[in-house]
Amino acid sequence: MTRPRYSARPRIQLDGRPMRVEPGSSVAAALAARSPGNSRVSVSGEKRAAFCGMGVCHECRVLIDGRLRLACQTRCQEGMRVDTVLEHSTPPGVAPRHDAAANACDLLIIGAGPAGMSAALAAAPSGRAIVLVDDNAAPGGQIWRDGPGASIPAPARRLREQLTQYSNITLLCDTRVVGMAGLPGQRALMLENAREGWAQHYGALILCTGARELLLPFPGWTLPGVTGAGGLQALVKAGVPLRGKRLVIAGTGPLLLAAAHAAHRAGARVVRIAEQADWRALLRFAYRLHRWPAKAAQAVALFNPHYRTASHVLEATGDGRVQQVRLRRADGEETIACHRLACGFGLVPNIKLGQMLGCELDAHGGLHVDDVQQTTVPGIFAAGECTGIGGNERARVQGTRAGHAAVGELTQAARLSNDLARWQEFADALRGPFALRAPLLSLARPDTLICRCEDVPQSALAAHQDWTDAKLHTRCGMGACQGRICGAAAQALYGWQPLPPRHLLAPARIDTLAAIASSSGNSLD
């Protein structure tokens, strides 16, 4: 698979006005290039814009050609009509019906990042029918996300090319899982793309659902211009213009430096990188990096003179969008003027689909797997960041092992144990130095919104004892993102454990539900 070539600048209609956009850029990039750059208005009247940058938070939802889509996940195309006024209704009509028999495969792989691509390539020589699904426009996952501002590394290019060499691998990009199709145990998932929805039946399943950012609330975090650190990276790759803009990046973990590097390459002025960990913890971590020379070299290459330890965000302020950031330092406070603020407080595994299917978790909150990557549910395997945060090298080894095991090649899977142990040691080394310190868990004020979808403030949650109680009384976690942002935040802040989803993983269109009901012989009437 060759990387798409971006040539002519497509013309789109944005809120009824014609606009030329950069080739290959996302709709979120087009929104950011205009003034104002917000994509929607919240339930309490606040302006909002792209936040997570990777299809998790749903803040950037807009109407595209009459259908509700996520701006950060959709590439601009010639003649596309984008509308930020969400009161419009979806045009009538039911999606084309799929033949259930034609949508059956031997092996279904969810997620086409490093783990998913490696799993597909390991399983492909067996001749089994493989379907590889990803909600991005091209394979690569978040780490190798494509776009006009992306630089795709050689390992990603090789994996993409190898995928095209197997006729038994069907790649479905721009496609997401919205839930289970049928009853539990029927081995079918509900898939949906921009045009239609269908039930995808499978024999074995490999979950390579990756991870998402932990995004903690603080005063001003809902202002347009505030994003996640990984969200900033994703938006840069999608073509969001940053040249000459002043950026502050805050939070914890190696992702801060990676985001700063991406922003600098895009022409931004990164004026501060605030890492909450202290220098002693980072020094201990750096001392261990000699065991992984490539990681040590990467750390040196990403060094930035504006990096500060024992520093964290306190508040973002501005008129209609972020204009200033107040930071806590070891020796006091500082206020910095900026155009954008990117905050990331680490990564959390994407486990919801596995939980919905009955898979149990391990002690660190990832999907529990055995020595061949099988979860606690027979026939369901997992690989990559959904089993714990550990980097793309670990993900590729796990994916390869899962691919072999899923088609019965257990001897080949067992041979990878030593390789995996080396990268698992690196994953274990990541946990301690970047553990969140207590001050970051008390940044929110009573009026700070915890649930961005339903505009639920911290004060509304204070009287509740657990996640279910809070949902019932405040609608926290019941908006478009289905608790992916506020659920993880509430778990960090209050120790609440969100319950696994029951049947639906994400909001689904009526035509998708109708098509699946029809294919199963049921009716929505």
Report each predicted region and the residues it spans.
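C-terminal catalytic lobe of FAD-dependent flavoproteins
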Residues: 308-364, 426-494
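A conserved FAD-binding loop/helix module that cradles the flavin
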Residues: 383-418
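FAD-site-proximal beta/loop scaffold in flavoenzymes
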Residues: 227-236, 340-390
